[in-house]
Each structure stands twice: as C-alpha cells, then as structure tokens.
Amino acid sequence: MGTIADDILGDLHGRILKTLDQLRTDLSAVRTGRASLHLLDNVRVDYYGTPTPLNQVATMSVPEARLIVVKPWEKSMIPPIEKAIREANLGLNPMSDKDLVRVPIPALTEERRKEIVKQVKHKGEEHKIAVRNVRREAKELIEVAEKDGDISGDDAEKALEKMQKETDDGVKKIDEIVAAKEKDVLQV
C-alpha cells in the first residue's frame, strides 16, 4: 500500500485511541458507589480568588471504600474546599475534621444506579459516533487520493478494509469499556 494510505490509516488509528482514552477519562468521573479520587477531578477551589484544581491545594487519599480524605496544605483552605465539593453537584456532603475534610461516599440507590448506567451507555454511544466520524473522514481522504491517482484502486480497497476493521475494533473496545463500567456501577 502507498504511504498516503498508510498515513491516513495511522491517523485513523491514533484518533480512535484518543477517543478510547477520552471515554475512559469521561467514565472515570462517573460515581460507582465506591470512593475514587477521580470523582473530585473537576472540583475547583477558590484559592485566594483563583479557581484552582483541588489536587493543587491538598493531598487526597481513599482510606476506606466509601471515604475520601482531603488534607489541605493550608488549614485556611478547609472551608473553601468544603464549599467547592458541595457546590460541584456530585451529591457529596463533605465534613471538616480538625485539619482535614472527610468526604463520605453515599451508597447509590437502585434507581440512581440505573440512571448512571443510562449515562454510561449514552457516553459510549457518543464515542462510537466519534469513531465512525473519524472513519468517514479517513474514507473520504482515501477516495480523494484514489480519484487523484495518488493510490491505486487495489490499495484503496485494502485501506478501506483495514479502516473498517480498525473501526470495528474501536467500537468493540468501547462496548467492553462501557460493559465494565456498567458492571462496576451495578455492583452493590
């Protein structure tokens, strides 16, 4: 196959991997009923007037399955940290305790678990669409290259077959990631 087709396939592969990474990142912030530091990834604390990521003003740990402990580097940050976690709409109720903030993770109700599973499936569908859009763009590039005479018809056909396999593999991987997250959410 020609280098143009190889370049297009390489780009397709890279973009599919980025989509899979983005899905993993998106799903890591979804509550499962167990404590995870990723739950607080998007929490911004007012640090002397500047919205600052929580992990830049405190040390965080998960000492128990349903508890996150946030230990600020400055004691004066305890009230703003509590406020930021409360206002992040994560359904969490932080409590200050001397020089740290305890964030108990409430158990999820069956109804809430089903709601979260729907969100997880929706995220999976969004990322499948992204993979298919990447394939469509790559297919158009292959067709233009063939039309312009940059690659032969046989090479274009081989590239399209590889492209379809790459896309199918990406979609299958998305299904696996979503299924694993669903299992995690439904596990009591």
Curated annotation (Swiss-Prot):
GO terms for biological process: cytoplasmic translational termination. InterPro entries: Ribosome_recyc_fac, Ribosome_recyc_fac_dom, RRF_sf. It comes from the Bacteria. The keyword Protein biosynthesis applies. Its main location: cytoplasm. It is found in: Cytoplasm. Keywords: Cytoplasm, Protein biosynthesis. GO terms for molecular function: ribosomal large subunit binding. It holds the Pfam family RRF. GO terms for cellular component: cytosol. Responsible for the release of ribosomes from messenger RNA at the termination of protein biosynthesis. May increase the efficiency of translation by recycling ribosomes from one round of translation to another. Belongs to the RRF family. This is Ribosome-recycling factor. It comes from Anaeromyxobacter dehalogenans (strain 2CP-C).
